[in-house]
Amino acid sequence: MPSMDIVSEVDEEELRNAVENSRREVAGRFDLRGKEIEIDLKDNVVTLKSEDDFICKQLVDILRIQLSKRNVDPSSMEVDEKAVHSGKTFSLKVNFKQGIDSLVAKKLVKAIKDSKLKVQAAIQGDSVRITGKKRDDLQAVMRLAKESELGQPFQFDNFRD
């Protein structure tokens, strides 16, 4: 019986590459030259530091663009509401969602069951296991998951026939 897992993960290597590319772009931009800017990545959290709140927002946009270029879905970003001011710098933290939390998993399973497809959906930790009789049903679930607006990108693993 065909089965697959629906997961939500960010490729750490691509994330690191996007952060490095963001640093290079900031170093080459004329409007940001001479400003104190730091972009740090640690444990799937990117810290953006600059002299100005507006520049922090520009750094978030630069990071989004670089993530898109590296095929990492920017909707996995959780940006802090407000930049934290400490001393003469502003800092913003950008977290990346790893795994599907239980509330999103329940909504996804409900959407799959409401679609009347002949598949079984089971929540397994931070992923959702889908089992069905036909490969076409699993592909329909893939389409449904990609089209659902649950605020999180989904990837598909362990596709077995």
From Swiss-Prot:
Protein keywords: Nucleotide-binding
Q: Which GO terms of the molecular function aspect are on file?
A: nucleotide binding
Q: Which Gene3D superfamilies match?
A: 3.30.70.860, YajQ-like, domain 2
Asked whether the keyword Glycosyltransferase is assigned, the reply is: no
- The membrane-spanning stretches of this chain are none
Domain of life per record: Bacteria
**What do the Gene Ontology cellular component annotations say?**
cytosol
Which CDD domains would you find in this protein's record?
Answer: YajQ_like
InterPro entries registered for this protein in UniProt: DUF520, UPF0234-like_C, UPF0234_N, YajQ-like_sf
Family from the record? Belongs to the YajQ family.
The job of this chain, per UniProt, is described as: Nucleotide-binding protein.
Enumerate the HAMAP family for this protein: YajQ (MF_00632)
Protein name as catalogued: Nucleotide-binding protein Sfri_0732
According to its UniProt entry, this protein's organism is Shewanella frigidimarina (strain NCIMB 400)
